[in-house]
């Protein structure tokens, strides 16, 4: 069973926990207090403040120096500006598959007013598609 928790969704902040993955970090650190110790990877979609809060990223990086951050190339400078070490960042290319020990992921292109991606997540035979802030999803599925 895939466990998930919607921490926040909407224009004031977005953060979703799926198993031990946090997708988007547009909330205060206080809202993550019950989950931040249990996440192994933070996936980021784009730079808008309701998805990416620099103060929270800074605090996560400081509190959890072994925490991994995953994103497409356009987010790397933003993470480094928040004090995340380049050695903590997994950089993804759209359409490629990346295998971790207990899950895999593949970033998908989304259409927004800034560069944006979603994620296909694979947990064995189970799949999750995470997509937000997009004008279209033509041809996109969880396959």
Q: How would you label these PLM feature ranges?
A:
Residues 16-18, 94-102, 121:
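Short acidic-hydrophobic surface loop/beta-edge motif
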